[in-house]
Amino acid sequence: LDAAWYKSNATRQLLDLPMDPFSGYASRKINAGNIQNEGLEISLNGTILDNPAGLSWSSTAQFSLNRNKIKELYEGVNLYDIKTFDAIQIVAPVGGYYGEIYGQTFMRVTDENSPHYGKIVVGDDGLPLISTEKSKVGNQSPDWMMGWTNNFSYKGFNLSFLIDFRIGGSIYSATASNLYTRGNAAGTVVNGDRAEFVVPNTVVQQGSGYAENTVAVTPQNYWERIGSTGNYGLPEVYTYSATNVRLRNITFGYEFNRQMLKKTPFQRVRLSATCNNVWMIHYNLPGIDPESVAATNTNATGFENGAAPTSRSYTFNVTVGF
């Protein structure tokens, strides 16, 4: 068992600050900021089974978590824009954490004394109203990650596999927004029908108060309203948990014993087959791999838009020794 806890501050980061376009430049580079990194790493490995019959099983688990807190940026700057995708921003706010996802949300009852506190406000047409202010809808960083490797051996045969756990964090899916807005997502059909419905947990404003909403809407009108915020739809709805558990790779091999190779010129022969990106055991983003992010030239990994799916690969190996 190995465990390590760390805490460090990275200062004078290279930042791009926006400038007045009339200056002739879009931004300027400065050295500023103070980001505090705090985390924990644990590694546990051992032999679980090693019997005289030749069967052995060894296992290794590696756990990690990390928090990047923004202590300060630059005088007069309280929020650094890592990347903006239309109405969605991935930012680093002072007092918050690196990679927070900001965007618009449903308009809700904010009076804590109201019996309808927290409910979505709709218009007279029964469709939800959208807030004009941006607020936090998630963070791209996982709460914790773990890799679990297992290795089994028996009389020349070997089987090993790695399971990856990425728990927590969020990702905005513009792909899901496009599918729902156009009625191509399974969620736009309930029990094989697109019947009118009353948006659940909603109220309509009446004078200085609110009343339960009873106005039914069509699925088409509802999803078009949700998709009308910018080009990518309402961030609150299309920000999903990025939690996923996957069988990352598996390898099966066989090594011939030397007795079998006595009449050959080989000292060693091993055959093996490997498959990578084998099986998505659990995920929350419908039909999309959370690792399929929209951009590769930025640290903003909490956004995807029609990205190509991650590939599955197969490898066959023959290893010989003379």
Residue ranges and their predicted role:
Residues 60, 132, 142-156, 248-253, ...:
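Conserved SET/PR-domain catalytic core that frames the SAM/AdoMet-binding pocket
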Residues 168-270, 275:
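Extracytoplasmic gating/loop element in the C-terminal half of outer-membrane beta-barrel translocons
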